[in-house]
Amino acid sequence: MSWHTGSNQDNKLFPKGKLSGSYAPLDIAFENSPAMNEFENRLCHNNPIISERSMSPAVSASYSNPEATSCGCMQTQTQPQHQTLSQHLPQTHHTDAHDQQKLSGIFYNRTTDAQNQFSETINPPPSYTVHNTDIRIPLNRQQQYPANHLGSELLEGYNNVGTEPCMGFWEILLLIILIAVLVYGIYWLYKSEK
């Protein structure tokens, strides 16, 4: 069987005639080949989140095996599938839950960030007062408006623009001009038809 990649780099990945372009079938990704082990090795070495328990045996052996090649990649070490599965099974539910909680706590525990955000020593409120009554966007707490503007209605998207009972002078003048233009346009159309 002949193989091709669409380029002259590595002629051992794709069967000729079965593929269009240089895309591999899905079973190549799960095959225990040197190319895929090298890819997984590089991925795991550059990703600090991955723990040693979740790595494949060839990659986890790279942490304990000092015989790496010159490019930093490990030689592939094949193991039977049942040994791979038994290594990945957790010993107890408690240790697995504890490790998961410890890992997620690093990235999702934001209580100290929230305390720093709402602490007045780190984020003091402004010393000036805001006299803006024409707030055109929903308020949020980071805009630091005074407390009388931080009602629940304003935080939910309510704005108080245009709540005065009568229209302003310029709005009335604009309305009169628009009505006059509309009447003149209707009159001009009526005259042009006759």
Swiss-Prot record:
**Membrane topology annotation:** Single-pass membrane protein
Task: Note whether Transmembrane helix occurs among the keywords.
Answer: yes
Q: Could you tell me which residues belong to the region Disordered?
A: 77-96
Mark out the compositionally biased spans (Polar residues).
77-92
Look up keyword Transmembrane and say if it applies: yes
**What residue ranges are annotated as transmembrane?**
169-189
Sorted alphabetically, the keyword list is: Host membrane, Membrane, Transmembrane, Transmembrane helix, Virion
Q: Which GO terms describe its cellular component?
A: host cell membrane; membrane; virion component
Q: What is this protein called?
A: Uncharacterized protein R710
Which lineage do the record's taxonomy fields give for this organism? Answer: Viruses, Varidnaviria, Bamfordvirae, Nucleocytoviricota, Megaviricetes
